[in-house]
């Protein structure tokens, strides 16, 4: 993913003639954007992560990976889960106009606690030093921002609410128990934390399910507009 994005960024820079660009990554797009920023820091103005696995990995990934080692049911259960997640990834690719190969098992490994710790050891810029603090606002000349949600069941018409209602059970008993169904509140912290408790689940954060978000919460589109203005006012 990182190398794919790096090539895309280099193409955009070449076509647009821009000196630097702003990167914004959701979910696994967070470490992907951070990787590109580490590779070409002089061409990146800012990195913003939304519901990203940054400070720590996802208990959901940990649980699925640990279940894969169970006797009898482990292998078939993991196969089923990866097929479902691959299908979901393909659906996202379809609605976003991209069609790329999916490897959800590799994604789970990278999103796990061990995978995230290994990634952060190589690419620490913007990661908080404390369990639930903020990271460096500026690192290698790049502005760092993040936001995330702590909603799970936000709209009864949204079919992903059922999935996140189940995945959120993986956070029971965890210190970082507040979550968006996939990522813990503190785990999402990176650079300047704009907010970490929007009443949004993991798909609400990018308005993925055709606007099926909570009617009582901030409109996700408004959050992105505000951030675009924030970057503009910062001269980015």
Regions of interest found by a model, annotated:
Residues 2-115, 180:
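Serine-dependent carboxylesterase/thioesterase catalytic core
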Residues 23, 117-123, 170-175:
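Short linear motifs at secondary-structure transitions and domain/linker junctions
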Residues 30, 39, 109, 123, ...:
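Generic alpha-helical secondary structure signal
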Residues 61, 82, 109, 120, ...:
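Generic detector of well-ordered alpha-helical segments enriched in charged/polar residues
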Residues 69-71, 93, 97, 124, ...:
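Short, flexible coil/linker elements and helix-boundary hinge sites characteristic
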Residues 89-156:
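Serine-hydrolase catalytic core
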């Amino acid at each position: 993913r990182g190398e794919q994005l790096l090539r895309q960024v280099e193409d955009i820079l070449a076509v647009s003639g821009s000196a630097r660009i702003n990167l914004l990554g959701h979910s696994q797009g967070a470490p992907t954007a951070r990787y590109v920023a580490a590779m070409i820091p002089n061409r990146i103005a800012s990195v913003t992560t939304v519901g990203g696995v940054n400070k720590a990995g996802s208990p959901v990934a940990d649980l699925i990976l640990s279940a894969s080692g169970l006797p009898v049911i482990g292998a078939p259960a993991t196969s089923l889960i990866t097929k479902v997640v691959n299908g979901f990834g393909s659906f996202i690719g379809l609605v976003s106009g991209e069609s790329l190969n999916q490897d959800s098992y590799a994604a789970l490994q990278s999103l796990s606690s061990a995978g995230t710790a290994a990634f952060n050891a190589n690419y620490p810029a913007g990661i908080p030093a404390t369990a639930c603090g903020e990271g460096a606002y500026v690192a290698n000349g790049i502005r760092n921002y993040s936001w995330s949600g702590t909603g799970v069941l936000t709209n009864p018409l949204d079919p992903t609410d059922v999935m996140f209602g189940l995945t959120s059970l993986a956070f029971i008993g965890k210190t970082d128990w507040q979550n968006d169904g996939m990522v813990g509140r503190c785990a999402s912290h990176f650079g300047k934390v704009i907010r970490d408790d929007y009443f949004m689940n993991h798909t609400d954060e990018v308005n993925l399910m055709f606007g099926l978000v909570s009617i009582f919460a901030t409109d996700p589109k408004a959050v992105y507009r505000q951030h675009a203005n924030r970057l503009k006012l910062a001269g980015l």
